[in-house]
């Protein structure tokens, strides 16, 4: 390993650690404002769990390739993803990592990776809805790399990340009007806000803010651009503070921050071995009986056979399990209640019980 590779992969580990800490610190806010696709108050918990899985994975994975490390972290996160937000983040992370494999993390490479993340995330959902985490993913992919700067430099990467986080923040603010359930509330989408927290953690890691440890970039060693993200960080924190104050005020009054659409039933997530054709069939059949269907490949097994992660909201958990069992043997199955009384109550399904 050369020194730069070691520094960069170490910085990836720092990014996930920081993201988990920041998500955990804001989990109560994310849970309180969670309204889409169902107001089950678990966005914060789901993101902490999913990103936490990625953070644990990178601590034991060994590779000098930043992209491969991110890709493998994404696969681990996707295999254990929770909720709509956790599943979409993991799908996005897999695509970003795959795009960066064999490349240094420059502004151009990062921009291309964000485009890959947009394509895969939007295609993973049967019915993508703007005004959510998807809008953040869409808008950051549209950010142009600064033209009047040296290609491949640390300064260009940092400035590009500044723009990416700024675009993410605008997308979060725009969710108030873009997502029907939020219109007129003055609140923002929880998944979108969670994605902003993760992206700002990446920006801070890349800039080495508050740390003398390695920064995440692939420029020349002599390129010592100073971090320029203090204002961006303040704006992100101000938005979090605003949501926290709103949640606290409602809690003091004994009222709900948002009254989201009532929904009963359960969330079913599972991993199953499928070909692309079988995955398409599973997606169609789950769409017929459920909502919020997400399907995305995790990793190739051999030939046309891949491991797929599947997410769906259904009224009858057995109906979803029957669809999966008709095409393969579901593994790592988790079922979580969506109704107000059952929300957050998760049960694991033993594969032997499905035979």
Residue ranges and their predicted role:
Residues 1-355:
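N-terminal loops that bind phosphate or other acidic moieties
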């Amino acid at each position: 390993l050369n020194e730069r590779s070691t520094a960069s992969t170490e910085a990836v580990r720092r990014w996930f650690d920081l993201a988990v800490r920041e998500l955990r610190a804001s989990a109560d806010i994310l849970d309180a404002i969670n309204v889409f696709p169902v107001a089950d108050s678990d966005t914060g918990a789901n993101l902490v769990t999913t990103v936490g899985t990625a953070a644990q994975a990178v601590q034991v994975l060994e590779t000098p390739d930043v992209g491969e490390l991110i890709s493998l972290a994404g696969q681990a996160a996707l295999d254990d993803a929770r909720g709509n937000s956790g599943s979409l983040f993991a799908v996005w992370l897999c695509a970003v990592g795959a795009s960066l494999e064999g490349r240094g993390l420059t502004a151009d490479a990062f921009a291309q990776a964000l485009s890959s993340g947009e394509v895969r995330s939007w295609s993973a959902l049967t019915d993508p809805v703007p005004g959510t985490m998807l809008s953040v993913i869409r808008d950051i992919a549209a950010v142009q790399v600064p033209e009047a700067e040296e290609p491949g430099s640390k300064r260009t990467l940092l400035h590009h990340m500044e723009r990416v986080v700024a675009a993410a923040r605008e997308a979060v603010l725009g969710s108030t009007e873009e997502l029907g359930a939020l219109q007129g509330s003055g609140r923002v989408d929880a998944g979108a806000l969670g994605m902003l927290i993760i992206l700002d953690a990446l920006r801070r890691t890349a800039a080495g803010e508050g740390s003398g440890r390695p920064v995440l970039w692939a420029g020349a060693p002599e390129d010592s651009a100073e971090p320029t993200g203090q204002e961006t960080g303040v704006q992100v924190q101000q938005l979090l503070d605003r949501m926290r104050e709103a949640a606290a005020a409602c809690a003091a009054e004994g009222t709900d921050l948002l009254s989201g659409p009532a929904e009963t039933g359960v969330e079913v997530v599972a991993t199953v071995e499928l070909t692309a054709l079988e995955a398409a069939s599973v997606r169609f059949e789950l769409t017929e009986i459920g909502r919020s269907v997400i399907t995305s490949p995790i990793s190739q097994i051999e030939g046309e056979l891949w491991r797929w992660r599947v997410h769906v909201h259904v009224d009858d958990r057995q109906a979803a399990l029957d669809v999966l069992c008709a095409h393969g043997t579901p593994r790592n199955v988790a079922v979580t209640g969506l109704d107000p009384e059952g929300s957050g109550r998760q049960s694991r399904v033993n594969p032997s019980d499905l035979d």
